[in-house]
A protein has these predicted regions:
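Residues in flexible loops and secondary-structure boundaries
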Residues: 15-17, 24, 41, 64, ...
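Charged, low-complexity, helix-prone segments enriched in Lys/Glu/Asp/Gln
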Residues: 3, 32-44, 72, 79-82
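Short, charged/polar N-terminal "headpieces" of proteins
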Residues: 1-25
């Protein structure tokens, strides 16, 4: 059993951290996530100092079966597979 959390800029994930009692590991998401973060920061005018840094946060720790490496890899794969859905949620207008 390992704990994991997601480091994100606003609602865009960037990194998965996973840990057990002995060690912590991280899995950086692919460049397309950072490119999206950078594009949104520019769009919102949040590219300098505190405006950019204030967007960063971490989810609460959650638990999942597996070693820290297995958990970080699995959660990262799920986020990678959900990238297109994230884009649609973020950019498509909502009805109504």
């Amino acid at each position: 059993m390992a704990r994991y959390r997601i480091v994100h800029w606003k609602d865009i994930p960037s990194l998965v951290e996973a840990a057990d009692g002995d060690r912590t590991t991280g899995h950086q998401l692919s460049q397309k996530f950072q490119d999206l973060i950078d594009a949104l920061a520019m769009r919102e005018g949040a590219t300098e100092g505190d405006a950019y840094l204030d967007g960063w946060g971490q989810s609460a720790w959650l638990e999942r079966d597996g070693s820290p490496d297995e958990v970080a890899d699995a959660v990262a794969a799920e986020l990678e597979n959900g990238f297109e859905a994230l884009l649609m949620k973020r950019f498509l207008p909502r009805p109504g």
